[in-house]
Swiss-Prot record:
GO terms for cellular component: cytosol; nucleus. This is Thiamine thiazole synthase. InterPro entries: FAD/NAD-bd_sf, Sti35, Thi4_fam. Its EC number is 2.4.2.60. The gene is THI4. Its main location: cytoplasm. During the catalytic reaction, a sulfide is transferred from Cys-210 to a reaction intermediate, generating a dehydroalanine residue. It is found in: Cytoplasm; Nucleus. GO terms for molecular function: cysteine-dependent adenosine diphosphate thiazole synthase activity; ferrous iron binding; iron ion binding. The modification 2,3-didehydroalanine (Cys) is found at C210. Belongs to the THI4 family. The lineage of its organism: Eukaryota, Fungi, Dikarya, Ascomycota, Saccharomycotina.
Length: 331
């Protein structure tokens, strides 16, 4: 009998809640409530505009960005979870740095829009939850790990925060085709920038000839192209992942330039060794000045195991690489 009363009470409360929601719906308020007649949108109009105005508004701003970021302090190649995490830490701590993010896809975020096997939830092992706390992303605490209800919640949140920084520009649908290099005084390679093109052009080089690229130069050079010792040299952080047409691109390009930077290849799945390994191996590259790696590109380059559908190392490796880059600019 007691259980029946309990169930009846729950049903009554549910019905009451539904009635309240219906009552609220009858007087719904939204952003346009003051300019739209209730239940009648027949007189709704947008402000007038000329087609050329739209074109000029887009064009001028994009080319202003191209001009401003033609010389950048930090170029991040790949806007996946590690690249975006690094961008957040860098932009937050150094608002004076010009940070260009180059993403080959139209949609940034890499593989972090879904969890494993196209499922929704994102699993992150502790202590990555501290980064989620900073970003104010809710999660379920399961002891040693946390669960974000949908991977897209993490990606959209960090992406939104990164894009709001005034010193960050995302160039999506843009591919890095090559690296700009110069001889190093110590006999290695100095990274001086990246070579860019529209992604669709890059992928069409086999069907059309003579489609030359553009460049983004790293800060640190005079107008004649020689090194300016008065300026802090910029850096490239490559976070291009391991899959797709541009996976591990910068690691592969370095290997092609110099055999000592040969790719070891990503090893089979082992979550416990993989995540710690990716974080430990992320950061600066020996023998290559001003070049940093993070995320799954690190696993491919250094021969670390893959971790599969657990994302803590993606964020943390980006944070670690960002910390090293911040030290570089602080020296």
């Amino acid at each position: 009998m007691q259980n029946e009363h309990s169930e009846f009470a729950k049903m009554s409360q549910t019905l009451t809640n539904v009635q309240e929601l219906r009552l609220r719906a009858s007087t719904t308020r939204h952003a346009l409530s003051d300019i739209v007649r209730e239940k009648d949108w027949s007189d709704f109009q947008f402000a007038p505009i000329r087609e050329a105005t739209v074109s000029r508004a887009m064009t001028t701003r994009y080319f202003e960005d191209l001009y401003r970021y033609a010389v950048s302090d930090v170029v991040i190649v790949g806007a996946g979870s590690s690249g975006l995490s690094a961008a957040y830490v860098l932009a937050k701590n150094r608002p004076d740095l010009r940070i260009a993010i180059i993403e080959a896809n139209v949609a940034p975020g890499g593989g972090a829009w879904l969890g494993g096997q196209l499922f929704s939830a994102m699993i992150m092992r502790k202590p990555t939850h501290l980064f989620l706390d900073e970003l104010e992303i809710p999660y379920e605490d399961e002891g040693d790990y946390v669960v974000v209800k949908h991977a897209a919640l993490f990606t959209s949140t960090v992406l939104s925060k990164v894009l709001q920084f005034p010193n960050v520009k995302l160039f999506n649908a843009t591919a890095v085709e090559d690296l700009v290099t110069k001889p190093s005084a110590n006999g290695g390679v100095t990274i001086a920038g990246v070579v860019t093109n529209w992604t669709l052009v890059t992928m069409a080089h086999d069907v059309q000839s003579c489609m030359d690229p553009n460049v983004i130069e790293l800060e640190g050079y005079k107008d004649d192209g020689t090194r300016d010792p008065k300026k802090k040299h910029g850096v490239v952080l490559s976070t291009t992942g391991h899959d797709g047409p541009f996976g591990a691109f910068c690691a592969k390009r370095l290997a092609a330039l110099d055999a000592q930077h040969a790719i070891k290849g990503m090893q089979s799945l082992d979550m416990n060794t993989a995540e710690a390994g990716v974080v430990k191996e992320s950061g600066a590259t020996a023998g290559v000045e001003y070049m940093y790696f993070a995320g799954m590109e690190t696993a491919t380059k250094k021969g670390v195991s893959r971790m599969g559908p657990t994302f803590g190392a993606m964020a943390v490796s980006g944070i670690k690489a960002a910390e090293e880059i911040l030290r570089h600019f602080a020296e």
